[in-house]
């Protein structure tokens, strides 16, 4: 894994060989928990929430107000340490049409896994995607979304630290499960709460944050707020960039 960190860090300063990388305001990897603690109805609400967020007026306006007016997004699903899938590779979103195309592909994709929860594996895949993206951006972000702690794969703090060394910020969206079954209680409601677990073990980097959502039905609203915050942090508004 550490060679991906080196590859990503060096690619930021060595790149321009055969052709110039495409410029965007932000490269964003969505890393989504699809482990067994999330049932099919909750999974559908997650997917619909992502679609609603990316096609919302607020998010599209935030994208278009950036210096370049475009972001690059990919989407990863994870469960156990060997259950990681890049569902959608890099897609550039710059307007309503490209946002809708991304949302349609996301909603249409079938669920990948049902295993345990290796947040570290999801982060590792996201670091790899960032290293190989081919985009040039002032900010690189991984969004981790889940309802439980890391209980498979390598230590999540190691994966987080490798991402931070590569210059990547990790943000989190902690989904609170208020009605866990007995065998998942410690997993979804760790001491101090899941948002605090994310802050201490998962997220990090400049302007990183954790957003908590208490209901899968409000996932889309939370994701919209999250995306607007991330996009706004990534770029200087065009009006300022154009000023003498």
Where are the language model's segments positioned?
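Exposed acidic/Ser/Thr-rich ligand/metal-binding surfaces
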Residues: 116-166, 244
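Second-shell loop/turn segments in exported
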Residues: 31-41, 73, 89, 105-116, ...
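Bacterial N-terminal signal peptides
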Residues: 5-15
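C-terminal "exit" segments of structured domains
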Residues: 210-244
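Sec/Tat signal peptide C-region and signal peptidase I cleavage site
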Residues: 16-20
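VWA/integrin I-like adhesion module and closely mimicked acidic/polar interface patches used
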Residues: 149-197
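Von Willebrand factor
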Residues: 22-89, 93, 98-145, 174-184, ...
